[in-house]
Amino acid sequence: MAVISMKQLLEAGVHFGHQTRRWNPKMARYIFTERNGIYIIDLQKTVKKVEEAYNFVRELAQDGGKILFVGTKKQAQESVKEEAERTGHYFINQRWLGGTLTNFTTIKKRTARLAELKRMENDGTFAVLPKKEVIVLRKEMDRLEKFLGGIAHMDKLPDALFVIDPRKERIAVAEARKLGIPIVAIVDTNCDPDEIDYVIPGNDDAIRAVKLLTAKMADALLEGNQGTEQQATTTA
């Protein structure tokens, strides 16, 4: 059975690309036609590419790999958080802080600080500190939670990235490429597919399209995790 159907893709509007004047010629091979000044993505190719990405993600999870979901545009924020939490993987849905991957030791210090502040809140330390100091600490904690909460438990670099709109997330893409971390991405008609290891040609601006494709990658992770559990049972 196919991982995803043409009907699902059509209903979610995955086939709608950008205006013809805003395009990357490298995406030509994934474009079916042009309609009313908008490029229409070839969904037969999308079906095939979703399957390739799904298989990669499933096998990665089966090997115990972890994925970092990245989507900071408004249309992606909720799906990225939901699906990462559903699968127990990581996410960044606010702003990509430069050096998140390439300067990971510094990022780890910030997530350690977040953990420390949460501990202080939970163990009653805040209750005995001066009110003004607590206000400052809470502000710091909220800011760290906002930008780094989704990677608070990421103690090593991720094994792959799932990116929504690699053009917007170009810093994340550049960092992953520099470190040789594979990238799976929803790539619209205005993006450069050559920077992506597993291209999913599709609409990165419609909430339904983003939700469908992000959920599909999350399903692949869950299926892969089941395989890991089965292997562990067999070994035991």
From Swiss-Prot:
The keyword Ribosomal protein applies. Gene3D superfamilies: Glucose-6-phosphate isomerase like protein, domain 1, Helix hairpin bin. It comes from the Bacteria. One of its GO terms (cellular component) is cytosolic small ribosomal subunit. Belongs to the universal ribosomal protein uS2 family. GO terms for molecular function: structural constituent of ribosome. InterPro entries: Ribosomal_uS2, Ribosomal_uS2_bac/mit/plastid, Ribosomal_uS2_CS, Ribosomal_uS2_flav_dom_sf. Signal peptide: none annotated. It comes from Brevibacillus brevis (strain 47 / JCM 6285 / NBRC 100599). The gene is rpsB. Pfam families: Ribosomal_S2. This is Small ribosomal subunit protein uS2. Keywords: Ribonucleoprotein, Ribosomal protein. One of its GO terms (biological process) is translation.
